[in-house]
Amino acid sequence: MAGTNALLMLENFIDGKFLPCSSYIDSYDPSTGEVYCRVPNSGKDEIEAAVKAAREAFPSWSSRSPQERSRVLNQVADLLEQSLEEFAQAESKDQGKTLALARTMDIPRSVQNFRFFASSSLHHTSECTQMDHLGCMHYTVRAPVGVAGLISPWNLPLYLLTWKIAPAMAAGNTVIAKPSELTSVTAWMLCKLLDKAGVPPGVVNIVFGTGPRVGEALVSHPEVPLISFTGSQPTAERITQLSAPHCKKLSLELGGKNPAIIFEDANLDECIPATVRSSFANQGEICLCTSRIFVQKSIYSEFLKRFVEATRKWKVGIPSDPLVSIGALISKAHLEKVRSYVKRALAEGAQIWCGEGVDKLSLPARNQAGYFMLPTVITDIKDESCCMTEEIFGPVTCVVPFDSEEEVIERANNVKYGLAATVWSSNVGRVHRVAKKLQSGLVWTNCWLIRELNLPFGGMKSSGIGREGAKDSYDFFTEIKTITVKH
């Protein structure tokens, strides 16, 4: 919709129509600290309308063949790809990430999400067994669950929203999605493409607002039997409490405190640039980012020197600048939270090698109030420190030495999270051995963030419940039924 007083005004998308809201909240451009957008402050009334629309659309959408639904998803992908630059510009402005990253990762992956699930939904099979001595045959069928409640985070806004919408739609469900109120623009833009792609009214409803108001209304609604959430552990605990009385299906993808383990036989020419990227990509605002780096003592000094030098080459600045590697953090509150971890580390006697409080950040006048922070490397810190145990979710990483394989495995596992890890070594036997012992849902060896969407994604321990991916997402968004026929 058109802006008012130069502000972009978003509207909810319910039953195929854009609808205004009675109240709005401000959304800020992270690179300037200025309000540039107003987001609906939705609540129970908007959720009731969305549930009604989704329930009414469900019988028709769920009865379509997988091939018909696949065609619609592919059409959404085509339209999104045609608008890639427009979406990338919007994502960068709304989230603070570099335009280069939005162009090369966020929006292309969003396109791929629709195409991937459009294809994978055509290749599922069912089980069948026979009990000849009883004259019985057993087989399974899967059916869509119904109305899917989807809650996505602010760090990869469209990327993770489509990672939920696409499999839910492909399986035959209808959707009520709630993006983060901090990054709602590309979700709103996506709504404009749905009708063009042939998505029937009510199949996808997107309701904007805060977690305590609209999020809780969605999660607690008795006619929304399934919730898929990506975000923080405290919010997941609240979702679990609200869902328990209704026995809802839950998929919870939460935080991480991801270790990188670098053995003395690692190829540092490959390891160092990859570990800088895994530590600071997207301002460190990726649940898979590395925030604990364990380096074998014999190469610790060399690694640290080269790692700090490489980190300092990552330029922080205006997200649209093609030479910039790190944009702005999501909000002023989050920036202060990340900075507070560095202050606490200093109070504990840690050393800061580069970044916050050490190097000077130079920004244009217009961006002085933006939420920028230099990539920061911390050493001389204990494993029990908050910087080594809590998810910081910013451009901060800790580098510590280790002696033996057994020691580093124990230390790497000594946190409540278990999402991802990386292992660097030229010893093939070692990387297999260590990967199996790490309490992580994903382990990369001699690489980072290479994803195969057919395989499970998700974490152990406090990093979540369930897995996402081709088969796992299909299983989550469907209910299985066993049928026995006596002949």
UniProtKB/Swiss-Prot annotation:
One of its GO terms (cellular component) is extracellular exosome. The gene is ALDH8A1. The active site is at 253 (proton acceptor), 287 (nucleophile). One of its GO terms (molecular function) is aminomuconate-semialdehyde dehydrogenase activity. Belongs to the aldehyde dehydrogenase family. It catalyses: 2-aminomuconate 6-semialdehyde + NAD(+) + H2O = (2Z,4E)-2-aminomuconate + NADH + 2 H(+). It comes from the Eukaryota. Catalyzes the NAD-dependent oxidation of 2-aminomuconic semialdehyde of the kynurenine metabolic pathway in L-tryptophan degradation. It comes from Homo sapiens (Human). Its main location: cytoplasm. It is found in: Cytoplasm. Gene3D superfamilies: Aldehyde Dehydrogenase, Chain A, domain 1, Aldehyde Dehydrogenase, Chain A, domain 2. NAD(+) binds at residues 209-215. Highly expressed in adult kidney and liver. Detected at lower levels in fetal liver and kidney. InterPro entries: Ald_DH/histidinol_DH (IPR016161), Ald_DH_C (IPR016163), Ald_DH_CS_CYS (IPR016160), Ald_DH_CS_GLU (IPR029510), Ald_DH_N (IPR016162), Aldehyde_DH_dom (IPR015590). Keywords: Cytoplasm, NAD, Oxidoreductase, Phosphoprotein. Its EC number is 1.2.1.32. This is 2-aminomuconic semialdehyde dehydrogenase. The record marks 155 as: Transition state stabilizer.
